[in-house]
A protein has these predicted regions:
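Positively charged, small/polar-rich N-terminal and surface patches that mediate targeting and assembly
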Residues: 1-107
């Protein structure tokens, strides 16, 4: 099955979402949504007065055309990937349908 759109999900260190979005826009992305998150997968287990501390993260969601996805993900990885302060990882998921997005030819 061919999908016209993909959801690119990026998980990165808090405060570096501008690096991700700058790279994504340069590769053709129109925009994205940034959410604040806490990482819970690590084994750090640090506590402060019995309260568990988790790494602060940002998550960026970008809806992209399927034929632009690889270039956007490559740009994110090169400019904000694991070897940078942003420490971003990204993956994509197919989107079966969308509503409310501007079409390519609408500019």
């Amino acid at each position: 099955m061919n999908f016209e759109h993909e959801l690119i999900t990026v998980i990165l260190n808090e405060g570096y979402s501008d690096f991700v979005m700058d790279a994504a826009r340069a590769a053709g992305a129109g925009g994205g949504t940034v959410l604040h998150a806490k990482g819970t997968g690590g084994t750090r287990g640090e506590k402060f007065f019995s309260v568990s501390l988790a790494d602060e993260k940002d998550m960026v969601y970008i809806i992209a055309y399927a034929d632009e996805k690889a270039a956007i993900m490559r740009a994110i990885n090169e400019n904000a990937g694991p070897g940078t302060k942003a420490g971003a990882i990204c993956f994509s998921l197919p989107i079966s349908s969308v509503a409310g997005l501007r079409a390519r030819d609408e500019g």
